[in-house]
A protein has these predicted regions:
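Small-molecule kinase domains that catalyze NTP-dependent phosphoryl transfer to phosphate-bearing small molecules
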Residues: 114-165
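Hydrophobic anchor at the beta1->P-loop junction of P-loop NTPases
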Residues: 7
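Conserved substrate/cofactor phosphate-moiety recognition/catalytic segment
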Residues: 20, 24-62
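P-loop (Walker A) phosphate-binding loop of NTP-binding proteins
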Residues: 10
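Walker A/P-loop
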Residues: 16
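ATP-binding Walker
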Residues: 13
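Pre-Walker A (Motif I) flank of P-loop NTPase domains
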Residues: 1-4, 69
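Conserved phosphate-donor/acceptor-positioning beta-strand/loop module used by diverse small-molecule
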Residues: 87-108
């Protein structure tokens, strides 16, 4: 078993971007939990339409953990069972003010779905529902979860340039 690094933070913190850059820097696989949670086959135009059951996600992730040497996972938290947590080498927690995170979520929705995400668009209701969910999320969700694990935790400021944070993290690993 190699290194399993989790990059976590609330929606819009920059988890996927940071995790992908870190994985490239340390030369290992990048995995985004969204690719495990959501089956992109059902509706490729709106891949977030149908999520897998939590138990299936845990099973898929456990198979990955048991089969991979090194990888960096992007996820809000690492609540995927004790086996997953036992494999964590390090957790990177990205902290970003709520207003910035929500703007990033909104901007990302528009980049991905364009006018379909706007009022009257095909995905407006789904996108609005997701935005409302992000806005209502408990700001302590990640830190509360972090307090339950026993592995090195590196906290970074997600408003800083990705390259600066990746350099800092790489030095600390």
């Amino acid at each position: 078993m190699g290194n399993v690094i989790l990059v976590c933070g609330l929606n819009g913190a920059g988890k996927s971007t940071m995790a992908k850059a870190l994985a490239e820097r340390i030369n290992c696989r990048f995995i985004d939990i969204e690719n495990i949670y959501f089956s992109r086959q059902d509706n490729p135009d709106y891949p977030y339409e149908k999520s897998r059951p939590y138990e299936e996600v845990v099973s898929l992730l456990t198979n990955i953990v048991n089969g991979e040497n090194d990888f960096v996972l992007a996820s809000v938290t690492g609540r995927f069972g004790d086996e997953f947590i036992s494999h964590l080498t390090c957790v990177i927690s990205i902290e970003v003010p709520k207003d910035i995170r929500l703007k990033r979520v909104y901007d990302r929705s528009y980049i991905i779905f364009g006018e379909k995400s706007c009022k009257g668009g095909d995905y407006y209701e789904q996108v609005k529902s997701f935005h409302d969910f992000c806005a209502s999320r408990d700001e302590n969700l990640v830190n509360d979860w972090l307090s339950t694990i026993c592995c090195p935790i590196i906290k970074v400021d997600g408003t800083l340039p990705i390259c600066d944070n990746v350099n800092l993290i790489a030095k600390m690993l």
